[in-house]
Curated annotation (Swiss-Prot):
InterPro entries per UniProt: Fungal_M35_metalloproteases, MetalloPept_cat_dom_sf, Peptidase_M35
Protein name from the UniProt record: Neutral protease 2 homolog MGYG_00813
Propeptide residues according to the Swiss-Prot or TrEMBL record: 20-190
GO biological process, one term: proteolysis
Organism lineage string: Eukaryota, Fungi, Dikarya, Ascomycota, Pezizomycotina
Main localization of the protein described in the UniProt heading: secreted
Amino acid sequence: MQVIVALAALSSLAAPALGFSIPRGVPVSQSMIDVKLSAAGNSMVKATITNNGDRALNLLKFHTIMDSNPTRKVTIESQDGKEVQFTGMMPRYKHTDLKPTYFISLPPKGTVEHSFDIASTHDLSRGGKFTLKAEGMVPLAEENGTTITGAAKYNSNELHMDIDGNKAASVERAMGIVKRSGPLTRIGKRTSIDMQSCSNRQELQALTAALRASAQLSSMAAQAVQQNQEKYMEYFKDPQYAQTVQSRFQSVAQESSSTSGGGTTYHCTDLMNGCEQGVLAYTLPSQNEVFNCPIYYSDLPPLSNECHAQDQATTTLHELTHNPAVQEPFCEDNGYGYERATALSAEKAVQNADSYALFANGKFLPMSSMLVTQD
């Protein structure tokens, strides 16, 4: 099925141009790329991406069918119509300073293939018949460029696979079970911090401050859902979801703060080897585990003064929305950055992690002066 290139407008509210920004005034183009899924083995899938246009494109791999990380590339339904549990990672990538290695170049009429084993990120041990489909959005740059100039929505064909459960069960999981040898410290009986991973005092202080700021931002955002309808509609589109959005913000505030028991574990460092280039932090939703990466500390301020920019507080908020222990169903990465997040339908926005992080950051810039100081 073909992909329609969607070119969204820049926000008049955002101070800087983010790495995924799409310039205002660029018209909607013709269908330019095609994504086709095909079976390549028992649980192996091949995605073929074709550039139907007359000019070369640079396609950003992050959060797309081409992502080299074990992210959710397809939705999988079993024969009874139930979605198969995802056991991979949900990373938050840095928006800025995009490197050429983050892109795949596709010449006019050219194709690129990307294969992945769905058994490495899904429990297919029951075996049987499954239906797969991929949809998302690919940020685009010009040939040899790294400046995002557009984005292509894609909806693949449906792929039907008959999978041998025993063979699928023998495939090594991309992200194993988290093992801890050290103690856990619960912040006010909420999010547990894995102290074994937090031997660096500065990293522990930064994470503790980010959790406190996340609690404050989320609490204020929950109030603003009802108090500022214009802002709510900008991000979430439909008033019928206001209670759901407010409830999720309240749940994140509770998980981040000091009231009663919570269900996530937060790690200062990467124990599962998920911190590839460009990854700020990531979540394993099947285990309710969150991990910070080195650039979370080196490249992000505690809380940004710039509208819709990334920082430690809203990155932590973003990651907590990915955890089913915070609220179910947990959030996906349906649209990344302001332009892509605000272009989502209401149904997609209410389940999009960045919509919550951007709403909190974009609405509450005065919070930068209220950020809890590090201990």
